[in-house]
Amino acid sequence: MASTRNPSVVVYHAPGCHLCERALAQVRALRAELGFELREVDISGDPALEAAHREWLPVVEIDGRRRFTYHLQLDAFRRAVAQAAALE
């Protein structure tokens, strides 16, 4: 029988980014249902994070892999989290 685990989801965001606010709200709403660990990272003031993510915000990573930028597709997000949870 395959075991499941709690995937790690990271959302990179910045103040004043309306797409970020929407993605954060969506991810927060799905957290309890899908059982993932959530880390929210404000990139403002960190030159390395700004260089890596500013033009793509929001950026959503699942288990360290960039999966979504700009808009979060809810069905695809659910599938990606479920796939990550099934990995051993």
Question: Where is each model-derived feature located?
Answer:
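Thiol-based oxidoreductase modules, predominantly thioredoxin-like and allied folds used
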Residues: 36-47
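Local sequence-structure signature of Cys/Sec-based thiol-disulfide redox active-site neighborhoods
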Residues: 2-29
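Small/polar loops that bind or transfer phosphate-bearing groups
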Residues: 12, 41, 69
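Short glycine-biased active-site loop of nucleotidyltransferases that positions the nucleotide triphosphate
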Residues: 50-52
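Non-catalytic, surface beta->alpha helical segment in thiol-disulfide oxidoreductase systems
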Residues: 62-88
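Structural micro-motif
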Residues: 54-60
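A short, Lys/Arg-enriched amphipathic alpha-helix followed by its capping loop at the start of a domain
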Residues: 30-34
